[in-house]
Each structure stands twice: as C-alpha cells, then as structure tokens.
Amino acid sequence: MSRKKRIYKKNTNILQEPVFNDNVLLKFINCLMFDGKKSVAEKLVYNSFREIRKETSVDPIIVFNDAIRNTTPVVQVKSIRIAGSNYQVPMEIPTHRQIMLAIKWIIESARKRTEKTMVERLSKELIDAYKNSGKAIDKKISMHKMAESNRAYAHYRWQ
C-alpha cells in the first residue's frame, strides 16, 4: 500500500441552471427540492419569478441576486473552549458558506410565512429580502449583532 497522498481533481464541469444560467439559482432550486422532485422545485421558482415580475416590474433574476446578496452574513460566532471556559469567537465565513446560509434562511423563512401557496410565500420573501426586510434579514442582523457583542474575544481566532 502506497503512503503517497492522492491528489483529486476538482469537478471542473460545473452545472448551470438551464433558463437563467446561474449557479446560485441552481443551488437554490436544489435546496428547495423535496424527495428528489426537482421539476416541482423548478416550477415553484419560475412561478415565483413571474409573481416577482408582476409585483415589482424588475427583472426577477436581479431581485433574486440582490436578495441573496442582502441576506449573506459576513461573520459568525464559533464556540471555542479555552482554559475550561467557552468563548463565542467571531470568525469570517467563507463565501460558499455565506451563500448557502443565505439560501437556507430565505427558504426557511418562506416556508414559515402565512400566505396560501408556496409560490406566493417564496416571491414575497424574495421581495422582502430584496428590500432589506423580512425574517431572513433579521437572522443575518442577529448573527452580526452576536459577533459584534463578542468582538472582545476576536483575538482567540487563532485557536
């Protein structure tokens, strides 16, 4: 058995969403999907994009990208144990995790809304995130407040 480390090539053929050619939208559809029913998730997203176009008369992909950008957190707190006590240490978040947290928060808050159909809930939540309001933005703000209040422990970041 060889002790040599194997170097694996990253997957270079990245899939893209067929209508808007957007990787983040493809990730959003995949996170929205239940039980492998991708066509249902795609219909939900495209119908909510139609609703967004009716309500705001702005290109829905611009609304979507701005909603994701407004919802992405920059810092998070991680619990680190030093000398028998736990500290909440603020740390920067890698960009792929920022996007995934934003997607997860938007979908989660859309599912908790009270509108009748998921299309309405998703479109309203995307519009709210586009306008810097809504539950997903509240989650981002609370995460940033937590990091700001624990800024005194930022020097523990190296551990």
UniProtKB/Swiss-Prot annotation:
| InterPro entries found in the cross-reference section | Ribosomal_uS7, Ribosomal_uS7_bac/org-type, Ribosomal_uS7_CS, Ribosomal_uS7_dom, Ribosomal_uS7_dom_sf
- N-terminal signal peptide: none
Listed GO MF terms: rRNA binding; structural constituent of ribosome
List, in alphabetical order, the GO biological process terms annotated in this UniProt record.
Answer: translation
Q: Quote the PROSITE patterns the UniProt record gives.
A: RIBOSOMAL_S7
- Entry's localization field: Mitochondrion
List the GO terms this entry assigns under cellular component, sorted alphabetically: mitochondrion; small ribosomal subunit
Instruction: Give TM segment ranges.
Output: none
The alphabetical list of record keywords is:
Mitochondrion, Ribonucleoprotein, Ribosomal protein, RNA-binding, rRNA-binding
* Matches recorded under Pfam families: Ribosomal_S7
Q: What does this protein do?
A: One of the primary rRNA binding proteins, it binds directly to the small rRNA where it nucleates assembly of the head domain of the small subunit.
Family the UniProt entry places it in: Belongs to the universal ribosomal protein uS7 family.
Subunit-structure text: Part of the small ribosomal subunit.
> PANTHER family per the record?
RIBOSOMAL PROTEIN S7
Q: Could you tell me what this protein is called?
A: Small ribosomal subunit protein uS7m
Q: Which organism is it from?
A: Reclinomonas americana
Q: Which gene encodes it?
A: RPS7
